[in-house]
Curated annotation (Swiss-Prot):
Its main location: membrane. Pfam families: MFS_1 (PF07690). One of its GO terms (cellular component) is lysosomal membrane. GO terms for biological process: cellular response to 2,3,7,8-tetrachlorodibenzodioxine; vacuolar transmembrane transport. The gene is SLC46A3. This is Lysosomal proton-coupled steroid conjugate and bile acid symporter SLC46A3. Residues 1-20 form the signal peptide. InterPro entries: MFS, MFS_trans_sf.
Length: 463
């Protein structure tokens, strides 16, 4: 008897992803620090290796380290761009016919291989530049975007009512927040008490358990309910893949097509800003004047991850008194406020207070996915989430690369510039949502519109 709950897989994968990101950044930071100059990095200190006096030679040295780390992150992200785009789009698109488990399994294998490589890299002190090669190879198996896309499609397959989709997706975001919050809070203690080697080994073990659960315990309703088993060549498969993507937009009426494109644009522009700025927080906190150590960085990550919990509570409460689109507006404008506050944060207290407006940052992610799923047919959910994941992979890598490049170029004269730029860029999804609102967005009316189009298609086929 197979289990139809994907939540345990999401739990383990979120733990691994949340722990990997800050650990890898700080590991690379320490390696570059030690290899760039003759300064030793003290891991027992209660403060970070950070000089606040601008006339000190160490201050110029740490600015150089910041630039090198930012550039290396840029190289890593670009190395996984093309294989990640191709694998994400293909794996999620074919999941409509071959089941949601396949992309979950392959992306989990890639994540496990990457974490094992991190263990070896740390234990044998291999050149850290080899991380670029592991990122490139791991991206061929899919990435976390592929995994989340498959999980969301898996959940949508089981939801019959539209309101149920919004709540269920919000529950997943809540679960992500709970895991990432606790993991982020403890990440500094992982480094301090266990070191990088054992921490990476724990990540690999959790990913191995996750893979075992998906392979042997998780059921696949799409594959089990599929009544046809068509064998086709590789070229025919690719043609069918792109044809279904084309038909997703072609079969829609003019108004629904316009709305679909507009919602995709809103989702990706918001994703671009939020994901692009995320890695900059750690570099910003390590640098002067904050000079945070690994424990404070863990606290900051935990506060950032708390937005998953507060976003879930916000969606749960707001869904009784307002539409999805109004919740998305709240999330965008509060995030914009947080970006501006972060840009001017110069003390630890100010930086913690700057995290408060980010409480509803995840709300737009949940409600925009839900809004998108409401304007397509049930048979188009897989290809829709493939498009979303493809655009998120492209947008995410481009965003991280862009923001790392901007931060590297501006850190010397004003580190907070990147956050001010992010606040300005958030006007794009806000304006786009205003246009959606002006088209008289109504969830029930679009449900009826889809039903009418489906009945028209059925009558055309009957004729």
């Amino acid at each position: 008897m197979k289990i139809l709950f994907v939540e345990p897989a999401i739990f383990l994968s979120a733990f691994a992803m949340t722990l990997t990101s800050p650990l890898t950044t700080q590991y690379v930071y320490r390696r570059i620090w030690e290899e760039t100059g003759n300064y030793t990095f003290s891991s027992d200190s209660n403060i970070s290796e950070c000089e606040k006096n601008k006339s000190s030679p160490i201050f110029a040295f740490q600015e150089e380290v910041q630039k090198k780390v930012s550039r290396f992150n840029l190289q890593m992200d670009i190395s996984g761009l093309i294989p990640g785009l191709v694998s994400t789009f293909i794996l999620l698109s074919i999941s409509d016919h071959y089941g949601r488990k396949f992309p979950m399994i392959l992306s989990s294998v890639g994540a496990l291989a990457t974490s094992v490589w991190l263990c070896l890299l740390c234990y044998f002190a291999f050149p850290f530049q080899l991380l670029i090669a592991s990122t490139f190879i791991g991206a061929f198996c899919g990435n976390y975007t592929t995994f989340w896309g498959a999980c969301f499609a898996y959940i949508v397959d089981q939801c019959k009512e539209h309101k149920q989709k919004t709540i269920r997706i919000a529950v997943i975001d809540f679960l992500l927040g709970l895991v990432t919050g606790l993991t982020g809070l403890s990440s500094g203690y992982f480094i301090r008490e266990l070191g990088f080697g054992w921490s990476f080994l724990i990540i690999a073990a959790s990913l191995a358990v996750n893979l075992i659960y998906i392979l042997f315990f998780l059921g696949d309703p799409v594959k089990e309910c599929s009544s046809q088993n068509v064998t086709m060549s590789c070229s025919e498969g690719f043609k069918n893949l792109f044809y279904r993507t084309y038909m997703l937009f072609k079969n829609a009426s003019g108004k629904r097509r316009f709305l679909l494109c507009l919602l995709l644009f809103t989702t990706i522009t918001y994703f671009f800003v939020v994901i692009g700025i995320a890695p900059i927080f750690i570099l910003y906190e390590l640098d002067s004047p904050l000079c945070w150590n690994e424990v404070f960085i863990g606290y900051g990550s935990a506060l950032g991850s708390a937005s998953f919990l507060t976003s879930f509570l916000g969606i749960w409460l707001f869904s009784y008194c307002m539409e999805d689109i109004h919740m998305a507006f709240i999330g965008i404008f509060t995030t914009m406020t947080g970006m501006v506050m972060t840009a001017f944060a110069s003390t630890t207290l100010m930086m913690f207070l700057a995290r408060v407006p980010f409480l509803f940052t995840i709300v737009p992610f949940s409600v925009l996915r839900s809004m998108l799923s409401k304007v397509v047919r049930s048979t188009e959910q897989g290809i829709l989430f493939a498009c979303i994941a493809f655009l998120e992979t492209l947008g995410g890598v481009t965003a991280v690369s862009t923001f790392n490049g901007i931060y590297s170029a501006t850190v010397a004269w004003y580190p907070g510039f990147t956050f001010l730029l992010s606040a300005g860029l958030l006007l794009l999804p806000a304006i786009s949502l205003c246009v959606v609102k002006c088209t008289s967005w109504n969830e029930g009316s679009y449900e009826l519109l889809i039903q009418e189009e489906s009945s028209e298609d059925a009558s055309d086929r009957a004729c």
